[in-house]
């Protein structure tokens, strides 16, 4: 059995540290992509009393949140009409991505005789989603004056927050500042929010009314940040499995598809029942590391859909069937941490964690 063990204490401590850091700003906790691979229901159930909002990518994720918590839920993505009635009935917050969408929302709200909570997404420079910056004030005014919309928030997203010195950060902040000024002229109660994890850590004066610390809440820090308080944030999860078989190679034998790994006579290999079919990165095959009984062992041969092998050498530490295998460590400096794995295969921690699928059991401890 493969288990992602999640520390409730570490998770809650991370959020408390963030809340202290952001002061009076509200916290919107992103739990999209199955809470970055950690499991939406478990994460929401164990944090709902610490955060103001949750945020997700789509309607189906929003329904998973509302099933276990009463916090407001903001959907970042485009809303599909087959779900809009249920979303409105559950007071799920809708993102307005263009001016024309307001009229469509109003029509549905009238039919249901229920107002829609909305946040307007403004494109200040990422050029992915959102109302064009030049059309922002008109759209905000229109939504604010609507009889069927409750304009709860206005937001944008930083394109280069992971590079705190990038000039686009200042450009986007300046644009958003002008949007905030216009919005607050309509109502001081409208929540303005721009910052993700890297945003509020890397830029000053950018918390506004609310921040959206996703990856930071799960314990992953930007390399550039060395603040003593924030450095107390830790990864919340470890990925564990078991040794299910020990194999001894004969002279000239290899292991795995195409037998790309050729061992030596008498070499022992441990078989671990996890593979790319579980969302574990295939690129790690033949170059990743796992921890068994506090000893690091290299992966050997290509990873398959349902399993991988590691070289025990002559097995001087007597690894046995049933021994626990740590595939992802919660200690960032370890060779098998999500941070180290991401560096090794040229990706990011988000990718490593969010692709772990439901063949892996999540367990809060």
UniProtKB/Swiss-Prot annotation:
Pathway: Amino-acid biosynthesis; D-alanine biosynthesis; D-alanine from L-alanine: step 1/1. One of its GO terms (biological process) is D-alanine biosynthetic process. Signal peptide: none annotated. The keyword Isomerase applies. It comes from the Bacteria. Substrate binds at residues 128, 305. InterPro entries: Ala_racemase, Ala_racemase/Decarboxylase_C, Ala_racemase_C, Ala_racemase_N, PLP-binding_barrel. Its cofactor is pyridoxal 5'-phosphate. It catalyses: L-alanine = D-alanine. The keyword RNA-binding does not apply. Keywords: Isomerase, Pyridoxal phosphate. Its EC number is 5.1.1.1. Catalyzes the interconversion of L-alanine and D-alanine. May also act on other amino acids. Belongs to the alanine racemase family. This is Alanine racemase. It comes from Francisella tularensis subsp. holarctica (strain OSU18). The lineage of its organism: Bacteria, Pseudomonadati, Pseudomonadota, Gammaproteobacteria, Thiotrichales.
């Amino acid at each position: 059995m493969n288990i992602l063990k999640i520390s409730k204490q570490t998770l809650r401590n991370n959020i408390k540290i963030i809340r202290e850091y952001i002061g009076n700003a509200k916290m919107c906790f992103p739990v999209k992509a199955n809470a970055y691979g950690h499991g939406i229901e478990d994460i929401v159930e164990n944090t709902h009393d610490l955060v103001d909002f949750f945020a997700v990518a789509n309607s189906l994720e929003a329904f998973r949140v509302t099933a276990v918590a009463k916090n407001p839920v903001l959907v970042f993505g485009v809303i599909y009409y087959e779900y809009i009635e249920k979303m409105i009935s559950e007071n799920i917050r809708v993102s307005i991505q263009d001016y024309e969408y307001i009229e469509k929302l109003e029509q549905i709200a009238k039919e249901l005789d229920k107002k829609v909570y909305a946040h307007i997404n403004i494109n200040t420079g990422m050029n992915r989603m959102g109302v064009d910056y030049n059309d922002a004030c008109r759209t905000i005014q229109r939504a604010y004056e609507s009889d069927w919309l409750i304009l709860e928030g206005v937001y944008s997203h930083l394109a280069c927050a992971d590079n705190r010195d990038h000039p686009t950060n200042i450009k986007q902040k300046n644009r958003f500042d002008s949007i905030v000024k216009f919005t607050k002229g309509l109502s001081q109660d409208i929540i303005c929010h721009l910052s993700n994890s890297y945003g509020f850590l890397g830029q000053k004066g950018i918390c506004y009314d609310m921040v959206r610390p996703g990856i930071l809440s799960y314990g992953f820090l930007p390399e550039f940040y060395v603040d003593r308080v924030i450095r107390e944030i830790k990864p919340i999860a470890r990925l564990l499995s078991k040794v299910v078989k020990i194999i001894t190679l004969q002279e000239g034998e290899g292991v795995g598809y195409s037998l790309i790994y050729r061992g030596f006579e008498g070499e022992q290999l441990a078989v671990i029942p996890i593979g790319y079919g579980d969302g574990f990165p295939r690129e790690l095959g033949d170059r990743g590391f796992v921890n068994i009984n506090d000893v690091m062992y290299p992966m050997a041969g290509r990873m398959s859909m349902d399993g991988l092998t590691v070289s025990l050498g002559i097995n001087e530490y007597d690894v046995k069937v049933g021994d626990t295998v740590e595939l992802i460590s919660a200690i960032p400096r370890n060779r098998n941490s999500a941070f180290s794995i991401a560096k090794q295969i040229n990706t990011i921690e988000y990718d490593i964690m969010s692709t772990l699928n439901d063949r892996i059991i999540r367990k809060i401890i």
